């Protein structure tokens, strides 16, 4: 069967393919590259110039090109100032290079990652008559129309401006930030939106794990109830609220648990200090980055997953916990309730209700039967609703195929 898409030019804001540090988590980008090159599709990535040599996939169908790395500048600026600087500096750094590259290699489509790519794609796609699509891995606070207007604009100004520059197709991954609803309300035609599920390592559901052996190998207590979370340790994950909830638990129940925080990031030292300040630092283990290959063993040796993300608790770690049969206690933000179904796959708590979070943890620590029942239902739910990486990337490729085929039909190209 003849394909419409044989060559893709990708504009990315990331200089490497790892999401949580070297070996610390498989990015969507990595799965995308593996699947498409396996299917004979030529990929050209235009990425920020790395500061040092980065690990890349070796494939004859994969080529990296670079542009000036504006994302290394002004990292110490306050968040809003940094974001506005990046938004202003990105087009001048990218547009000329993207136009030259697109004219040289003549891709079937230009695919941009994140809202940063919208203006360059809009300009170059129209100028060179090349189909364009943007992939949004979530929309941050763009769905939070409940915020006061000033707060909403402070959080989302650059995304709102970027959406003024349309592209042919918007691929939005469902991370729980309700991207389809947000873009539609902001004026993107619904027929131009493809709302796709996140991919998962669905084979994890069938991986056998000896809990005792895994706990011993990872230095975890053999008999305690493990309440875990893992992510990049940054402010938006609100791990300090997780720790404060544990501090509010009934003391005899708290003595039965060990808290395990996986991942690394700029907040780690502050969180370690907070655990000591709360008086149970000896019951908290910070593992650092957990290699992706070990996450399934880590989760299947755990008992409860705590999810306190400010943006969404439908991101990959809570989903992976459900897939591994671990019930999730989560703050109910954005689209979290799509996967954390209260009383079925876990327990939901009103956002920022730390005392309520503590009570929910107590329920699962106290009631072994309920905890196991929710875990079994979580695994069954994940088997039914989650999709594999291959299936998810194939959905994305189908979107691109249909877009390019339609463009060719309009031009009268067979």
Regions flagged by a language model, labelled:
Residues 342-343, 347-354, 363-368:
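Conserved acidic donor-binding segment of nucleotide-sugar-dependent glycosyltransferases
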Residues 310:
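Aromatic "clamp/platform" in nucleotide-sugar-dependent glycosyltransferases that forms part
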Residues 289-290, 297-302:
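Short alpha-helical donor nucleotide-sugar binding micro-motif in glycosyltransferases
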Residues 140, 151-171:
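Membrane-proximal helix-turn-helix segments that form the acceptor-binding/catalytic region
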Residues 1-53, 58:
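N-terminal subdomain of nucleotide-sugar transferases
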Residues 112-117, 136:
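Short His-centered aromatic/hydrophobic patch
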Residues 327-330:
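Short hydrophobic beta-strand element within catalytic cores of glycosyltransferases
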Residues 176, 199:
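Carbohydrate-associated surface elements
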């Amino acid at each position: 069967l003849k394909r419409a898409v044989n060559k893709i030019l990708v504009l990315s804001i990331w200089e490497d393919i790892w999401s949580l540090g070297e070996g610390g988590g498989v990015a969507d980008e990595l799965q995308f590259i593996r699947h498409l090159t396996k299917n004979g599709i030529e990929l050209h990535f235009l990425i920020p110039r790395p500061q040092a040599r980065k690990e890349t996939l070796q494939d004859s169908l994969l080529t990296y090109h670079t542009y000036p790395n504006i994302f290394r500048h002004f990292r110490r600026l306050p968040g809003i100032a940094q974001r506005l600087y990046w938004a202003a500096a990105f087009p001048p750094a990218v547009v000329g290079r993207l136009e030259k590259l697109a004219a040289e290699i003549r891709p079937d489509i230009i695919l941009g990652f994140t809202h940063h790519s919208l203006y360059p794609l809009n300009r170059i796609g129209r100028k060179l008559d090349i189909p364009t699509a943007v992939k949004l891995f979530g929309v941050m606070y763009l769905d939070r129309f409940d915020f006061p207007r000033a707060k909403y604009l402070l959080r989302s100004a650059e995304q709102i401006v970027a959406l003024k520059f349309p592209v042919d197709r918007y691929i939005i991954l469902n991370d729980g930030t309700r991207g389809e609803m947000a873009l539609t309300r902001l004026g993107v035609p619904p027929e131009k939106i493809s709302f796709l599920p996140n991919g998962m390592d669905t084979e994890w559901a069938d991986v056998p794990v000896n809990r005792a052996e895994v706990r011993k190998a990872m230095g975890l207590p053999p008999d305690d109830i493990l309440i875990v979370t893992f992510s990049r340790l940054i402010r938006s994950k609100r791990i300090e609220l997780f720790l404060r909830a544990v501090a509010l638990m009934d003391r005899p129940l708290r003595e039965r648990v060990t808290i395990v925080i996986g991942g690394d990031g700029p907040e780690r030292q502050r969180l370690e200090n907070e655990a000591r300040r709360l008086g149970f630092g000896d019951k908290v283990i910070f593992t650092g980055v957990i290699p992706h290959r070990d996450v399934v063993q880590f989760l299947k040796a755990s008992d409860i997953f705590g999810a306190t993300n400010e943006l969404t608790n439908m991101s990959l770690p809570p989903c992976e916990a459900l897939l591994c049969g671990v019930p999730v206690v989560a703050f109910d933000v954005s689209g979290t309730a799509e996967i954390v179904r209260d009383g079925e796959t876990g327990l939901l708590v009103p956002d920022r209700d730390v005392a309520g979070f503590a009570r929910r943890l107590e329920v699962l620590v106290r009631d072994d039967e309920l905890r196991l029942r929710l875990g079994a239902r979580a695994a069954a739910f994940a088997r039914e609703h989650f999709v594999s990486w291959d299936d998810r990337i194939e959905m994305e490729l189908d979107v691109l195929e249909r877009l390019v085929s339609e463009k060719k039909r309009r031009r009268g190209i067979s």
